[in-house]
Curated annotation (Swiss-Prot):
The keyword Membrane applies. It is a peripheral membrane protein. This is Putative membrane protein insertion efficiency factor. Pfam families: YidD. It comes from the Bacteria. It is found in: Cell membrane. Could be involved in insertion of integral membrane proteins into the membrane. GO terms for cellular component: plasma membrane. Belongs to the UPF0161 family. It comes from Lactococcus lactis subsp. cremoris (strain MG1363). Keywords: Cell membrane, Membrane.
Length: 90
């Protein structure tokens, strides 16, 4: 199931996404987030996390980093990589 979902996202990235204007306000893009979430948390939780991310991505949201969290969560991961690296070096 995991491979089927990842393949579906890859097909979207290859065939559909290039025909649409760039719209994702987060890094990584919503489709890459979906793939990472499925690979890290499995098909059920990954699909739920990816869908929640797509619903969060709209013109009125605050753009920025939204990395896939280590633990399952449907909320935005507000930790930015720069801050995380600073904390790790302490």
């Amino acid at each position: 199931m995991k491979k089927v979902l990842v393949k579906a996202v890859h097909c979207y990235q290859r065939w559909i996404s290039p025909a649409l204007p760039p719209a994702c306000r987060y890094y990584p893009t919503c489709s890459n987030y979906m793939i990472q979430a499925i690979e890290k948390h499995g098909p059920d939780k990954g699909l739920a996390m990816g869908t929640a991310r797509i619903l969060r991505c709209h013109p009125f949201c605050q753009p920025g980093y939204d990395l896939v969290p280590e633990h399952f969560s449907l909320r935005r991961n507000w930790a930015e990589p720069e801050k995380k690296e600073e904390e790790d070096s302490k």
